[in-house]
Design a protein with these regions (language model features):
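N-terminal amphipathic, basic helical "cap/leader" segment at the start of enzyme domains
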Residues: 21-131
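A glycine-rich helix N-cap at a beta->alpha junction
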Residues: 194-212
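Bacterial N-terminal signal peptides that target proteins for export
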Residues: 1-9
Length: 212
């Protein structure tokens, strides 16, 4: 295959990926659930980074990242992170340049909840608005038992901590940059994310290719 043909194929693939990521629903490709760096190496290389290249993540990488963060990893519907009593009350929102999407772990797809570039609203630091992906972690308290709801924030915080570490380890394995952040304005995000009174923003996490 000649170089011009290879370049043309690459351009078509990038165009298709960009078009897919502009859709109201993004059907993610099946995630890779094997391979990557050994766990101990990923732990050794895990770190927080605050300098990101603006390039969008390839759709396959986004798919693998979301599965690693909070995907279904067993036939019984259990996930890659633990929740108290398996309530699975944590929702993951992907804030991309073209819009905000809610991750559906069972169907492994993204559903758009808001169009437009809302990345600047996902955090106060300068790097947030230019990074290709900000993950926002939300607790849906309607899935939790009323009799123990007063104690549930700490349970949800533990679950979100596990998700964020999943993301860190995936990024270490794949050579991506990431940082988890408490600096996220949950009240400002409530409207674009369509969060009702039972939902609360817990943390956010910025992900992307490392700045050159």
């Amino acid at each position: 295959v000649t170089r011009p043909i290879r370049l043309a194929c690459l351009a078509l693939a990038l165009t298709a990926a960009a078009t897919a990521q502009d859709a109201a629903e993004i059907a993610l490709p099946a995630p890779h659930t094997t391979g990557g760096k050994p766990l101990l190496q990923a732990l050794r290389e895990r770190k927080s980074s605050r300098a990101f290249a603006p390039d969008p993540l390839p759709l396959a990488t986004l798919s693998d990242l979301l599965w690693a963060a909070a995907g279904v990893n067993r036939e019984d519907g259990h996930r890659t992170f633990p929740t108290a009593n398996n309530k699975q009350e944590i929702e993951v929102y992907a804030v991309l340049k073209q819009g905000v999407y809610l991750y559906d772990p069972k169907a492994h797809r993204l559903t758009r909840v808001a169009a437009g570039d809302l990345r600047a609203g996902a955090g106060g630091q300068d790097f947030v608005a230019g990074a290709p992906l900000n993950l926002v972690y939300v607790t849906d308290y309607s899935k939790t038992p009323a009799e123990s709801r007063a104690r549930w924030p700490i349970f949800s915080a533990a679950a979100v901590g596990a998700i964020s570490q999943n993301v860190y380890l995936f990024c270490a394995s794949q050579g991506l940059a990431a940082v988890v952040r408490a600096s996220v304005n949950g009240k400002a995000l409530a409207e674009p994310l369509r969060l009702g009174p039972d939902r609360e923003v817990v943390l956010a996490q910025t992900v992307g290719l490392p700045a050159k």
